Amino acid sequence: MQTINELKHYTFQAMLENSIKRFGERPALSFVSGEPISYNEAGEQIKQLQQRLYCLGVNPGDKIAIYSHSVPHWGIAYFAIVTMGAIAVPLLPDFTDKEVKACLEHSETTMIIVSEKLMSRVPDTVSVLIDIQDFSVKKGTEIRNGNPPPHTCKEDDTASVIYTSGTTGRSKGVELSHKNLVCNAIAGQSCQRINEYDRALSILPLSHVYEFTIGFLMFFLNGACVYYLEG
């Protein structure tokens, strides 16, 4: 069980650094029938994606949407975005093209990481489009070289703009800070103790805050492995 004493700060940077340090070679993320990604490997993939985003012009405070069914690279993409100071905009995979366009316009988001299945729903107004499967750039131009400069996240920095499912009308955007989300993951351990030998099957969309915090972050925080269904 991890507490704020281990993390020192309620930020995704603190969580990521702690998990890699404590559980480096342990399996972290995987498809049910695939080869797991270790915590060390996840950390390297996060750095590689951050470099790609930086070369594409991403700066702290920029918004990047994640539009995909739940897959191992969803969490990689999220950590890469928020630990470089940018803001993640998770979109539900069942959003229509009109709903996607409305959310992107409302949040002023022009960059998106998306699964191949959902690419046809992404509007032409998007300037940067990245395939979540291998983080290849499908649309966009690199404007600089090198690595992103060091960035220190603060607890009250906005980590996500979450859009509701829109059951009472148009989806509404809600800003959530690093502290909001990391604190929820820590608090969730009072209901279910997790350790590095646990394994979880995630079936709900990671764009739901519940699944993201309890079905992903709480396990990542404690060195467990989260599995996802393919297809």
Question: What positions do the PLM features span?
Answer:
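Conserved AMP-binding/adenylate-forming core of the ANL superfamily
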Residues: 8, 17, 25-71, 75-79, ...
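Conserved ATP-dependent adenylate/AMP-binding module captured primarily in the ANL superfamily
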Residues: 93-122, 184-201
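ANL superfamily adenylate-forming
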Residues: 117-155
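Structured binding elements
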Residues: 85
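Conserved AMP-binding A3 loop
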Residues: 38-40, 159-185
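Conserved pre-ATP/AMP-binding loop-to-beta segment of ANL
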Residues: 24-27, 145-163, 170, 193-199
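Conserved AMP-binding/adenylation subdomain of ANL enzymes
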Residues: 182-199, 206-231
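Conserved coil-to-alpha-helix start sites within the AMP-binding
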Residues: 68-79, 94-98, 204-221
